[in-house]
Amino acid sequence: MVTKTLSVLFVASEVEGLIKSGGLADVAKALPKALQTLEQDVRVTIPAYRNIPNIDSAEVILSTELDHWPHTAYQVKKLSVEGVQIFAIECAKYFDRPEMYAENNQAYADNGERFSFFSTACLDMLPKLAFQPDIIHANDWHTGFVPFLLKSRYQQHDFFENTRSVISIHNAVFKGVFAYDELQCLSEMHSYNVPEASVSDTHVTMLKAGVMCADKINAVSPTYAEELKTELGSHGMAAEFQHRSADLFGILNGCDYGAWNPETDAFLPRKFKATKHSMTRGKSACKQKLQQDVGLPVTDCAVYGMVCRLTNQKGVHYLLPIIEQFLKNELQIVIVGTGDPVLASQLKELSALHSDKFSFVEAYNNELAHLVEAGSDFFLMPSEFEPCGLNQIYSMAYGTLPIVRSVGGLKDSVNDYDQEPEIATGFAFEEPTPQALLAVLHRSLLLYAQNPSEIKRVQLYAMQQDFSWEDAAEEYLAMYHSAF
């Protein structure tokens, strides 16, 4: 165990408990909290978006401006999430908007400028607040310029002389590609062509800037770290990840068992623990409540749940062609999610045709998400790619067996029943096709129908797995120390 206390600034575009659009927010809450439990000195900084609760009345701890960002004042407001201090950077010009990144599925045209400003302000505020971090931990493209600016501008100052940077890659699809002329306030981008960030003579990518300039890089699972070194897995940045291979770590995300625990979950009609009797009765009560809430007949058939963004990344396009064939069996499917309107329309049509077996809820509701995790027998994650994934970990905690494609963090966290029955925690397939998904669905259903006691054994084993953030935080600490 690494014992030396480090000061860490965790820089993210969102954090669960204040504002969230995806899994990054979960990590931005849970990892700093776990690091703090390990007696590290941690702060989190995010933009002060309009929709953060009570942001207007939050304490202002700094009012200043960026000297080289003309006429742009900003404030830092102090918030807290479960004991972790949050620095929220407020600048109405950039963050007083209805949404975080986009409106009506259209990204804000000045996102490059917005998050360049945020990255710069993150560094500018630190001497003024007298918080001197050993590690600045950036996340994804939004904060990719933090390691770049630290290296190119700020590290020449005594205050930052011993500060090191890390960047986490949660999803390399989104790179933050912008034209040089969209970033006019970053003089470094105009005094010379920046090889660390450039993708052409006219454009830079913020993610590449972070990857090439950070002292250490981590992917959110060991398999994803390997996938990033391929063109397919990195979505066009294989050369950069290969170049930085010696500094690339793969650390599997943890699970926030405070929020996802069937023994304490307030959303469940009956709580349960990892014993055969408790799990059987608890999951039965949760299944009945789930069926009632989504309008399906209350029966003891196998229930397959799915909670996701409706995108091809999540494998919805593998599921759609084979749903009707699979529904010919004695089972039910519940899908909860929002996203691509074309996929949503197709799911609505299918649920209308098979209303006794298939329910599609076009919404995200936290209570319903918990009920799907607890009341389903199987949880669908047939992802095209999945850097880490969290729902498969939540599912196991609730004795719901994940059915996954063997990629990224899904491969690292789920043991396939056919490959390793004694230590199985779910079912997996590899081929990215609807037919491969259908085959694994039939495998799971066959075991459910023919060997109920074996299903219960696997469910109980899955419930006993531990993906704690404390273990992950120990790995992050080791990576931080390796940066010096």
UniProtKB/Swiss-Prot annotation:
Annotated positions binding ADP-alpha-D-glucose: K20
Pathway: Glycan biosynthesis; glycogen biosynthesis
EC number: 2.4.1.21
UniProtKB keywords: Glycogen biosynthesis, Glycosyltransferase, Transferase
Keyword Methyltransferase: no
A Pfam family matched in the record: Glyco_transf_5
Main enzyme class: transferase
Residues in coiled coil: none
Stated role: Synthesizes alpha-1,4-glucan chains using ADP-glucose.
Protein name: Glycogen synthase
